[in-house]
Each structure stands twice: as structure tokens, then as C-alpha cells.
Amino acid sequence: MACPCGARVLVEILTGLLSLKNQSPSTPPESEGEFTRNYILGPKYIIKAIEIFSTMPNTIPPFEYAPVKTTWLKRDVLLFAHSIGCKAGDELHFLYELHPKFQVFPTYPIVLTFKHADIDIVDFLARNAARTLPPGCPVLDWSVAVDGRRRMEFLCPLPPSSEGKTWDIHTKVLGVFDKGAGKGTVMEMEHVLKQRESGQVYTRAWESVFFKGTGGWGGERGPKMNEHVPSTPPRRPDAVSSFQSNAESAHLYRLNGDYNPLHATPEPGKSLGYGGTIMHGLFSWNITARAVLSQFGGSEGRRLRDFEAMFSSPVKPGDKLDILMWDMGLCKRATSAVRNDESLQEVRFMVKVGDRVVLSNGKALLKCEDEGVEVKL
């Protein structure tokens, strides 16, 4: 598939060369040089242009969707906290709406890109199949889509309910990349949660979606998935936490709004080579955020400023997840969610099931002090 930008240039070349300055065959050119340029070299340039532009990759330009309204209730944020394993005790303020420090777990907005304003279950595959795709993008099958990478910046704590104000998710496709025949396609997107009346941005998130086996359509290869991502240090972790999932963990988590059948019944996972049902990638991502915040942030949601990780291999219901964390000390301002006068603590992490890495290249940034809470070093 030729590059759309190249096609436009090719049209301009053809138009210019074939117009021959609007001369008819009976009108002689003004000079011998002009005759050579128009009638002899012109066709050669056309052929060369066709050769060049026919081999150029299809570059998908950025594409922005219309804002999508989203809503949530206190019940939704309580359900989310329960689904990622928050416990009564040090995390009761995420689980009980009358707690004096009741707050929304900071990564909750990640599920709003699925939930929108729904109050009931929706057909995940039908909704995504109805998406408008960027010009030049091939048709993508969401039944073969899995998470590649997620990152979120936290600019303002979310209120316990959306009631009384209007909230929108602004989604932009940053690029669509062809990883090769038999491999797959990667779509990079950005999601911004904004309060409409004030214009205040609350969170900004980035995701890479990998569509298995859909490559070879002539698109740009794009960057490697592991370029410019943090790595874990070659030493023993400073903290380790474990989470034991069960057969119903995915069924509970999906009630947050992600109703992909891949995480509810064995058949889709078997057809994709996973052997059965797999957990939501964001389930592992969110329980890891909870572990990092508990270990290094005193379970204080406002401390979390930035969180990211790559999805390396699937997790199955019943797997035990071991979360390995490294304290990297203080770091400089590296995110728009942080004020210039704030100090940040950086934590690197990975997650394993046995010896297999399931989350890699993880990094969290936490505010060092918040209302007298000491940093756990």
C-alpha cells in the first residue's frame, strides 16, 4: 500500500508534467531545453516517482476521535478497589465510602476508557468493531487484540462520583504500525480525562494495543515496543509482594467495564493459543500499582504521579503473581503531572508468575511527601 502523503505528491508531479504548461501538441516549446525537459525527461521522472512511492510504507497520520462522555458512581470505585485486592485495614479508605479519608484508587480512570457512561454490560467486540479507523488503517479484529504497554499520568485526584459535572475522554490515535506478515499490528493511543466545565485535565494515559497475526499490510514498522522504556537494576529487589488470583478474579474485574470475552470464557483464549481464559492485562497492572503504592507510598493515592509497564506474557486465573520492586531514589521532574517544586521517588518493578515475567519495564513515580507522610525507603 502506497503512502497517502506520497500519493498526493505523485498526483502533483503527474499533473505538472502532463500539463506541459497547457501547451497543445501543435504549439512548439519555447526552446530545445524546454522540449527535452517536458517531452523526454518528463516520462522518466514519472516512472521513477511511481517506483519510489509504490514502495513507501503506509504512514497513518494522527487521528482524533470526538470526546466520549463518561460517568461513575461511588459504587463503581468501591468495586474497582475490591477487584484489585484492596484490603480492610491500611486500605479501608479505598473500600468504605464513610471513611474520613475516603478516596478513589488513583488508577481507576484507566477503566473509564472501557466503561464510558454505561450502566449495564456492553458487547466489547461489537463496540470496538464499530470504531471509526484513521484514513489508511486496515480493518482490525479486536478479538485478537491484547495489551502491549500502558502508562498513566495523574494530575488531579478523581472525585468519588462524576455527578454534578460533565466528564469527557479525549482519545487520539498516535500511530498504527505494521510489525510484519504473520506478526501483528500495533495501535498507539492517548486518552485524556477532562472535566468539561473547568477544562481541567485529571489523567493522561497512553496505550499500545497489539493485534496478533494482522501484519503485512504495507504499513510503517514504527518503533520497537521496548525502546525508551525503563529497566530493572541487576540486584536483589528492595521489596517483594505477592497476589494470589483465583478462578473468579477476571469475572470480578470485568465488571469495571472491560467485557472482552477473552477474559471470561475459555474458547477465545484457546483459539489464540493461550490454552483458555486469561486475565485482563490491566488486572495485573492495577494490582501492581496497589502493591507499589502500599510499599512505597503509604497507600496514599495522591502520592502516585506516574505509572507504566509492558505486558510480557499472559496471566491465567489462579496464577500467583510475585511483584518485585526496586527503590531507585530521588529523580528529577519527568512528567507533566508533577510541579517543578515537587520531589519524586522512583520505583522500578517487574511481575513474575513462577520464573516467567508477565509485566516488565515497570516504573512508578511517587511524590516524596504528602501531608506529613514519610517516604518508605
Curated annotation (Swiss-Prot):
Pfam families: MaoC_dehydratas, MFE-2_hydrat-2_N
Chain spans, region Disordered: 220-243
Keyword NADP: yes
Gene Ontology CC terms, in alphabetical order: peroxisome
Annotated binding of NADP(+), by residue: K101, R196, T265, I287
Domain MaoC-like as annotated: residue spans: 233-332
Reported function: Probable dehydratase; part of the gene cluster that mediates the biosynthesis of hydroxamate-containing siderophores that play a critical role in virulence via intracellular iron acquisition during macrophage infection.
Protein name from the UniProt record: Probable dehydratase NIT22
Organism name: Ajellomyces capsulatus (Darling's disease fungus)
